[in-house]
Amino acid sequence: LPPPGLPQRAAATTLAQFPVVLPLPLSALRSAFPVLGNPLNYGRAVALTPKQFRYGFGNAVSEEESQRLYDRYSVAGPGRPLFQAAVANFNPASATKVNTKNPERGPLLVISGELDHTVPSAVAKASYKQYKKNPNVTEFVEFAGRGHSLVVDNGWRDVADAALSFVTRF
C-alpha cells in the first residue's frame, strides 16, 4: 500500500481529460461549449442554463429529474479547468498532467456512465488505459444507461455500492 498521506485506494468518477487521453467526442465539446465558446470565460465562473445542464448532466434521466438535479446542484463553475483540459494535449506542462505510473498510488476504480455526454465513455476508457499501466490494481466499470449525473441521480446507490465494494477489497 502507499505510504501514509497518500490515498490507500480510490474510486474516481467521470475523470477529467488529461494529456495523452486523445478521444474528444462531439458530445464532450457540446457539453463544454457554454464555457469554451467564450474565451473570456477562462477567468470566470459560468452557470449553465437548465437546457445546457440537461444535455451535459441530466441526459440519462427524465426531464423532471434533470430539473430537480439542476435546482438542487447546479452552481456556476470555474472556466479555467475546462480550458486547461481542452489544451492539455498541446501543452506538456499542462496543469492537468497526471503521473498515471506512480508506483505509490493505491488501487483505483475508474467509474463511467455509458451515456455521459460530458466525459463520454471513450474518454473514460482512454483514461483507464493510461491508468492501467500502473503496477497497482486498476479496474474499470461502466454503468449502462447512465449519464454524468450518475453519482447524484436516482441510481446513485448502485455507483456507491460499486465503489464501496471495490475499496473494501483492499
Residue map of PLM features:
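Conserved alpha/beta-hydrolase "acid-adjacent" motif
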Residues: 117-126
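Glycine-rich, phosphate-binding/catalytic loops in enzymes
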Residues: 25-29, 126-129, 159
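Flexible "cap/lid" loop of the alpha/beta hydrolase fold
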Residues: 2-41, 84-88
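Catalytic active-site module of serine/aspartate enzymes centered on a nucleophile-bearing elbow/loop
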Residues: 134-170
